A protein has these predicted regions:
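Short, surface-exposed, polar/charged, turn-prone segments marking secondary-structure boundaries
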Residues: 92-93, 141
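Sec-dependent bacterial lipoprotein signal peptides
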Residues: 1-20
């Protein structure tokens, strides 16, 4: 009986300690980050093991690279319900997101470019458009 109680206490302790770790993310510079849910976000605030952010590129971000000025991203549409956004957004935002999500669903394998200095997000792009834009912007990441 005491062994069982010890196991329960250890399990509870492990759960408690790991729940306080916060959100895992990789800093991409200028407050941009890749977070564990496979999104690229712009961090607005970080305090008390909580992360507040604006979503920039939705899941599934499978690959990314960055330098001092740009972040380049490879995203795959996974067919999830994540892209069925709710009707809670205002009309301008909802229409904009629907148009972007429709394009993501159509392309499926999307590329993005984020200019960290101007906060400009270019995408979703097909591979050939992405390569052309990288040449135009002299991106060599």
């Amino acid at each position: 009986m005491s062994r069982r109680i010890l196991n329960i206490v250890i399990l509870f302790l492990c759960s408690f300690l790991t729940s306080c770790l916060g959100v895992f993310y990789i800093d991409l510079g200028n407050h941009y980050a890749w977070i564990e849910s496979r999104e690229v976000v712009k961090i607005t605030e970080e305090k008390d093991n909580a992360l507040y952010y604006d979503e920039i590129i939705y899941p599934q971000v499978l690959n990314y690279n960055y330098d001092d000025q740009y972040i380049i991203v490879y995203q795959v549409y996974d067919g999830s319900d994540y892209y069925d956004i709710s009707a809670k957004q205002d009309k301008a935002e909802k229409d904009s997101l629907y148009a972007q999500f429709d394009k993501i669903k159509e392309i499926k394998y999307c590329y993005w470019i984020i200019d960290k200095e101007t906060d400009q997000v270019i995408g979703p792009l097909r591979k050939d458009d992405f390569d052309r834009r990288c040449q135009e912007l002299h991106i060599e990441i």
